[in-house]
């Protein structure tokens, strides 16, 4: 989308795929920003070095601190910002069985799930969107396929297994080949990521309510970073969506001022309505037992400074203590992971 919008302005665009492995990321960046943030920063450093004119990021993955001389040159129109519950049969959250197993590696989603359903068992879930869906769908599909094979061998009147297989979608066929590690009743994904993968209409989903599952700041948005004075004006004129920029600026300002970006479960959602930006923020303890939340209409005329004031009030209302506790947990986890293992939970996932 970014390339096509720039192409429409008769600007020649060449896409460069950058594969940065964990081994290539500086330890200092990983420690300070987390692995995802370190990857984002490594791309931005290529922009500042002149190796790239611009970098395209998922905004929710971007650290709130920006290097000097680097700016968000463009924010295209945002995709849906909320989360969806994905199950093999479209089950809603309140319909999940007691102690159901739900997959996510997002601190925020884990805490929000436990706040809504303390009985749930949350398990880590890694990989891209396709991989996560395959992990969810594999057990039930493999059981059904085996049932049809057994029925055929026993001479029972049942659908032919090969015919059943041809009726499956590609993601279901891939799931049939996947080795099952942990059986899950549901997983939580960003609606935007599922839509961009082209799989949204193929998978049963249920939107999670934004008032209790406040999205990650910037979720659903794309950010194009560039160095000041370079192609910034061209990018901004071609792709910038004013509403999306205002909303994401508010969300990221609240996150930056509250602090605790990659160590605490934090959700911030902003919606531009006329002369005000309706803003909701939610800071949770890791187990979801404590929730600090508030809403405020911020004047669009000074939305950034108003967002900073809103964040300061949140800290005074108890967010600072919740974040301090989260930091202690993160430091304890880091100490236990010094042997080289990855942490189980990350700040945010797909």
Cite the ranges covered by each PLM segment:
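Small-molecule-sensing regulatory modules
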Residues: 1-19, 32, 135-350
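Generic structural signal for residues in well-ordered beta-strands
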Residues: 13-15, 72, 122
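Short, charge-patterned binding micro-sites
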Residues: 21-26, 131, 142
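Short, structured active-site "lid" loops
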Residues: 27-54, 172
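Short, Asp-centered acidic motifs that coordinate Mg2+ and/or phosphate
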Residues: 52-56, 101, 185-186
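A conserved helix-loop-strand patch within extracytoplasmic ligand-binding domains
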Residues: 59-60, 69-118
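Short glycine-rich anion-binding loops that position phosphate/pyrophosphate groups of nucleotides
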Residues: 59-62, 192-194
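Short hydrophobic/aromatic-enriched beta-strand-loop microsegments
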Residues: 74-76, 120-129
